[in-house]
Amino acid sequence: MNSNRISLNNLSLFFFMFVILGFMTTAGAVDEATNELPKEKQTSLGLYVTSAEAYDKWLAAPDDVKVLDVRTLEEYIYIGHAPMAWNIPLATQTHEWDADKGYFAYQPNPDFLSQVKEVAEPTDTIMVMCRSGGRSAMAVNLLAENGFTNVYQITDGVEGDKVKDSNSYFNGQRLVNGWKNSGSPWTYKVDPEKVKLTTADEAVAGKQ
């Protein structure tokens, strides 16, 4: 009788330690994954997926998962996009050259939050992408600051990270990862219902 009780106690202790170890391992894996991300891709919510994982997550529950593409309208149209993704730009392209940064400057989309709220609730599962993970991280943080709680950063974006191999013909090109390189579906075809025009875009459209 006593030996049985001891065995049960040992089993309970083993199970308890197994659960604790599993929790610590999972937490460690999350921390490790976060630490491997460049600072500019990290978010306050700490929820991360790759493009392939994001597509699988959407595919499992297409009515419950929202995918946001926060690139400019021009990128969305001419570089291609995930067919289920809403285009709600975090910022729009200007025609002002930034000599220090080496590209044309962006200006914030003042309607970003209100436009996201038109398609998603603060408790919805939302996955956000941009070109390669920088703007999407900023978008996730902005949403988190305004009450959204379940927003994932798609870490590799639409185009992915650059090849860093000076001996490669593809050095500097975005072919390492990303939605377009993952085998997930993408298209150039635009569904106007999934495009949220910014104030700047509407002004341009009104002149045409």
Where do the model's predicted regions map?
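Rhodanese-like catalytic fold shared by cysteine-dependent sulfurtransferases
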Residues: 7, 27-52, 57-63, 77-125, ...
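Short, surface-exposed ligand- or partner-binding patches at beta-edge/loop junctions that are enriched
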Residues: 128-130
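Short hydrophobic beta-strand that contains or immediately precedes a catalytic carboxylate
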Residues: 66-71
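Bacterial N-terminal signal peptides that target proteins for export
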Residues: 2-14
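Bacterial N-terminal signal peptides
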Residues: 12-23
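Conserved G/P- and acidic residue-centered "switch" motifs that form tight phosphate/ATP-binding loops
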Residues: 133
